[in-house]
């Protein structure tokens, strides 16, 4: 079952109703944010009209997968017959004919806690100590039978150890031959070879970073999106999740920060990388907001309460600029 993104954004209920109306097993899905939007936008009255019991494969890919989103979606729609084991985290890209890893089918998603401090140095520790700051990753499944996956150092082209983050390289029958009439880019992207091993395969360089654990692929982020602050690697989705989970009101009211409407990125100022965090907040909160910069740069630091909340969860540095915007601005 397929639907245009515009039609979905107009009415997330429309997507679920189309699934409900199919008289047979349904395989369809979307990125993580699609499930988050369904949780927040579909009403109880609309849920009462849905039968999602035949939704056998609910694929989730194209962006970082959040286990909390999967759990929230199940809790929100279990009354419609939706099954938790229908969730199907997967990984793919157009150059690999969309599907590279996924599943297993009819089983709960697999997740893993790693040491958040060590991954900033591209080191994977799947047994973090009790006092370590942890990061939860959802597996994107096992490689398809015809696919070969290597985790490779993008600078040396040598295969990484099992405890290192590297670039995801893919080889297999479903990988495209190259880009039409772009020979130089085709050679750079589709004809990569692993150095130091006997392997005649040509590999597709995905530009995505990750690692393999127990034959499950974990995607940590995209190489071009990495924010490098003081020699440490920070993934924008981690910063965005931290800000989304922060509560500037200290529990007094519903958090004004809109989940999923936060953007973290870096800019260069005087050849130095600076972190910028932009967040959509409730319009009423924006009027009295003192913890954010309102769409303009400032030398002042963010409020320490909000900053400390973020530090406890993930961040090891202060944002250089925090921007607050009204709804639908980001």
Give names to the regions the model predicted:
Residues 33-36, 63, 174:
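Alpha-helix/helix-capping structural signal
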Residues 137-150, 154-163, 167-229, 233:
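Conserved ATP-binding/catalytic segment of the ANL
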Residues 5-8, 24-28, 59-66, 138-139, ...:
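Hydrophobic alpha-helical scaffolding
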Residues 174-175, 189, 216-244, 281-320:
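Adenylate-forming
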Residues 189, 205-209, 226, 245-282:
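C-terminal boundary motif of the adenylate-forming
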Residues 92, 149, 215-216, 243, ...:
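Residue-level signal for inorganic ion chemistry
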Residues 16, 24-29, 41-134, 148, ...:
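Gly/Ser/Thr-rich phosphate-binding loop
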Residues 1-19, 235-239:
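ATP-dependent adenylate-forming carboxylate-activation enzymes
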């Amino acid at each position: 079952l397929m639907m245009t993104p515009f039609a979905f954004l107009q009415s997330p209920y429309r997507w679920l109703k189309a699934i409900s109306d199919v008289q047979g097993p349904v395989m369809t899905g979307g990125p993580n944010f699609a499930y988050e939007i369904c949780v927040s936008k579909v009403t109880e009255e609309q849920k009462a009209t849905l039968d999602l019991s035949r939704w056998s494969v609910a694929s989730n890919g194209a962006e970082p997968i959040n286990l909390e989103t999967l759990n929230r979606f199940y809790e929100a729609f279990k009354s419609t017959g939706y099954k938790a084991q229908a969730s199907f985290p997967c990984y793919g890209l157009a150059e690999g004919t969309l599907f590279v890893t996924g599943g297993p089918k009819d089983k709960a998603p697999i997740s893993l806690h790693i040491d958040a401090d060590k991954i900033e140095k591209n080191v994977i520790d799947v047994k973090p100590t009790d006092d370590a700051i942890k990061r939860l990753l959802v597996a994107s499944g096992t490689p398809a039978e015809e696919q070969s996956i290597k985790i490779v150092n993008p600078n040396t082209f040598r295969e990484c150890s099992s405890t290192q983050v590297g670039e995801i390289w893919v080889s297999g029958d479903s990988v495209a031959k190259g880009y039409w009439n772009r020979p130089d880019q085709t050679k750079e992207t589709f004809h990569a070879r692993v150095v130091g091993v006997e392997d005649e395969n040509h590999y597709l360089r995905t530009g995505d970073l990750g690692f393999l654990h127990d034959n499950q692929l974990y995607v940590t982020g995209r190489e071009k999106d990495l924010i490098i602050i003081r020699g440490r690697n920070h993934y924008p989705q981690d910063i965005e999740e931290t800000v989304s989970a922060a509560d500037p009101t200290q529990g007094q009211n519903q958090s004004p920060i809109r989940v999923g409407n936060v953007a973290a990125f870096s800019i260069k100022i005087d050849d130095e990388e600076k972190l910028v965090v932009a967040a959509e907040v409730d319009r009423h909160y924006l009027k009295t907001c003192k913890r954010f910069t309102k769409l303009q740069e400032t030398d002042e630091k963010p409020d320490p309460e909000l900053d400390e909340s973020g530090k406890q969860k993930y961040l090891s540095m202060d944002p250089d600029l925090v921007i607050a915007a009204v709804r639908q601005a980001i």
